[in-house]
Amino acid sequence: PACLGGVAPRDWCMVYPFVRSYDWYLLPDEERSRIMAAHGRNGFSKYPDVKGSTLAAFGMSDYEWVLAFEADTLDRLEGVIHHQRYTEARLHVRQDTPFYTGSRVSPREWAERQPRA
């Protein structure tokens, strides 16, 4: 996902959907901006090597947003997600599962891992 922004793909990727709390969209714009700025500073100041992408998914599925994070190692992905649990923004998350995490593989490697009929 970060490669869409011109960043080289990392070896590990985590993708998950999420839905904001019902009251999130009733907060003043300034408050939401403040909360999200603090949330971003919290995670990416400690994990600047982790690259993230956010996709709005309103009306396309059961989720409002889809997030993707990429890192060179699995522990960096786990670290940033765990670190982000301790922010005010977490008070405004209704659902943020399921998580899909895996290492980057080539299409050939992926095909070779598939069950044979």
What label would you give each PLM region?
Residues 1-45, 58, 72, 79, ...:
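Short S/T/G/P-rich N-terminal loop/turn motif that feeds into the first structured element of a domain
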Residues 12, 63, 95:
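Residues that flank catalytic or metal-binding motifs in active/ligand-binding sites
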Residues 45-47, 72-101:
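An amphipathic, aromatic/His-enriched active-site/gating alpha helix that lines ligand/cofactor pockets
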Residues 49-56:
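A short linear hydrophobic-aromatic micro-motif
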Residues 56-62:
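A short beta-turn/loop motif at secondary-structure boundaries
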Residues 104:
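Terminal substrate-recognition subdomain of acyl/acetyltransferases
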